[in-house]
Amino acid sequence: FYNCAIGVMRGAEAIDEYIGLPRQEAFDIEYWALEEAKLQRMPKEKEFARKVVVVAGAGSGIGRETAIRFVREGAHVVCADLNEEAAQATADEISAKIGKGIGVAGTGVSSCGNVIGVKIDITDSESIQAAYDKAVYAFGGIDSVILTAGIFMAPNVDGEFSVKQWELVFKINSIGPYLVADAAKKIFMAQGKHMKSSVVITTSVNAVVAKKGSVAYDSSKAASNHIVRELAVELAPYARVNAVAPATVVKGSLMFPRERVMASLKKYSIAYSEDESTEELRNKLAGFYAGRTLTNSPITPEDQAEAIFFMAGDRSSKTTGLVFNVDGGLHEAFLR
């Protein structure tokens, strides 16, 4: 190699003057092709790598499974819940599996790793902003907001709902989603249109299915369906807004305590014993609901998490204002 280089230099000097390559160009020739080959052999980056996702309702059920799903695909996740201990429990469960990173120094969450737990009250603008502030301080911004929090209230013994019940159900199920998305809008606008942000809200197929005993809940979900469409208009072009509408999810849901499960079994004339465990009773009820669907399948939190993950990501980048049913084929919820 040395002799060849000397020969080239002598040949150049015989004609005119030898001028060596700039050091950067020589480096590019010698090393860049090798580095490029190394990059091409690296595994493909996960779909939500380097993205930050806030999951409101992450303390249980659909929200918990959604947080786990996003972390599995590389996201940094803020587990938020009205029950701060439940939110932190989900965060701790995830951290135990994936480990902790170094976080961001000086933020108070310097050992946060990929996930943190925070408190959020989706009916309180200050609480929502505080949760978002912690997300931004920990991870630098927010790419997606997922809202799975909700409430079901049963009527009294006479089948009536009080005004206070109506107000609380609508405050959580309808006004809450608006407040959460509206507060996120300010962050999305500051980050810019190029960030391709998204919001996914859990509504319900009960929004279009009329039945006795749940008029407040069903009406609030009908309102939230249209709020999603309005938010899609309001947040464009900074973020897409969509909804995932599940059929009844019994597994892991705080909306199905033992008392409600037993009341539902009695309502549908399903035989049960009070000696059975809560899990056994829930499985019976889930089996009944599954039998009403075209696929005869129980609807699980994992099913909803998968749909939410899809709606939040780039694979649905051309979709906004959509209410996406994940109900096993509940024909009563077919729109007409």
What are these regions (language model features)?
Residues 156-158, 162-167, 289:
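Substrate-binding pocket helix/loop in short-chain dehydrogenase/reductase
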Residues 181, 220:
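Active-site helix of classical SDR
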Residues 152-155, 308-309, 320-336:
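Short C-terminal tail/terminal secondary-structure segment
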Residues 204:
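Residue(s) in the substrate-gating loop at a strand-loop-helix junction
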Residues 47-78:
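Canonical Rossmann dinucleotide-binding motif of NAD(H)/NADP(H)-dependent dehydrogenases/reductases
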Residues 158, 209-215, 296, 314:
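Active-site loop immediately N-terminal to the catalytic Tyr-X3-Lys motif
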Residues 186, 233-237, 317:
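Alpha-helical segment proximal to the catalytic Tyr-Lys
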